[in-house]
Amino acid sequence: MGGKMKAIVKNENAFGATLKEIPIPSINENEVLIKVQAASICGTDVHIYNWDQWAQKRIKTPQVFGHEFSGIVAETGKHVTNVKTGDYVSAETHFVCGTCVPCLTGKHHVCTHTKILGVDTAGSFAEYVKVPARNVWKNPADMDPAVASVQEPLGNAVHTVLESSQLAGGSAAIIGCGPIGLMAVAVAKAAGASRIAAIDKNDYRLALAKKLGATITISADKEDPLEVIDTLTGGEGIDLVCEMSGHPAAIAQGLKMAANGGRFHMLSLPERPVTVDLTNDVVFKGLTVQGITGRKMFETWRQVSHLLESGLVDLTPVITHQLPLEDFEKGFDLMRKGQCGKVILIP
């Protein structure tokens, strides 16, 4: 295709990013070039923007980042048959090898050689982005581009919540009400949970959790989550605890509040080792602890589509800000302060 485009680039090994003009990516015979309509800011992007310890170890500058997006196919490689120019799409952002043991046994989401869009390859905070054709997901023509751009993080929430087979009529606790935690509240409601506790220190996000279906919100700064959960459940504990915060104290509390025989699903990424009481909080309780990474390909995407198209999940309350790409610094400031749900950048 050729030409130039605007993109947000992590240009230096320091805080912040730069809006630059760079070449439009060229594609190979199995790739697709997409004109980005909407790109949402993820917690991973904030790590990169802040240049924290994780980013310093993981990111090689210069790097175009961003990975949650929707757009229109602008060009296809000569071997691509599953999509065509003009198709309205989003994409699975974990690029897998297809040849390792996990891939060959259907566990693509834990591929040994995963590469991530906007982390290992040029990302979607740009006017154009390229992805492998096999990663492209076609969107309904009437889906709002902002909503279409957040299907990937909704997939994280869906994977976290729906791994439990015992949620209908049961109880769920969502610890950490960032955007994916908020989505998990909505998914738990759609899955039939009768009691949903949302736990955070941010009153703004707890209010959003209430709108999305939380039956009780717990401000961890103002009350003891374990005491509230004990009262709420009559001492029985929570059937499914979803840990989205990554804070060591919250992780330990989450294990304690889980019911005997319950489940503890962890999507969060603690920045340091966590000390927990495995004997009493896991072994003697018969607790199932499961790490969650990415989305099952493409089972989770089908679940996401069903939840959105059926109206069982409405992400309108989660999408709180839409800004032009040029105002990315304002978007990152909102994310860093926690005074937002999902922030969408429009190229």
Swiss-Prot record:
UniProt-annotated site: Important for catalytic activity for the proton relay mechanism but does not participate directly in the coordination of zinc atom, residues: 152
Q: Give a yes or no for keyword Metal-binding in this entry.
A: yes
* Active site residues per record: 44 (charge relay system), 47 (charge relay system)
Q: Any idea where this protein resides?
A: Cytoplasm
- Which Gene3D superfamilies does the entry link to? Medium-chain alcohol dehydrogenases, catalytic domain, NAD(P)-binding Rossmann-like Domain
- Which Enzyme Commission number(s) are listed? 1.1.1.103
> Per the entry, which co-factors are needed?
Zn(2+)
PROSITE patterns per UniProt? ADH_ZINC
Q: Name one GO biological process term.
A: L-threonine catabolic process to glycine
Q: At the top level of its lineage, which domain of life is listed?
A: Bacteria
Report the cofactor remark: Binds 2 Zn(2+) ions per subunit.
Q: Which InterPro entries match?
A: ADH-like_C, ADH-like_N, ADH_Zn_CS, GroES-like_sf, L-Threonine_3-DHase, NAD(P)-bd_dom_sf, PKS_ER, Zn_alcohol_dh
A GO MF annotation of the entry reads: L-threonine 3-dehydrogenase activity
Give binding positions for NAD(+): 180, 200, 205, 267-269, 292-293
Enzyme class per UniProt: oxidoreductase
Record note on quaternary structure: Homotetramer.
NCBIfam families noted in UniProt: PRK05396.1, tdh
Tell me the protein's name.
L-threonine 3-dehydrogenase
Highest classification ranks of the organism = Bacteria, Bacillati, Bacillota, Bacilli, Bacillales
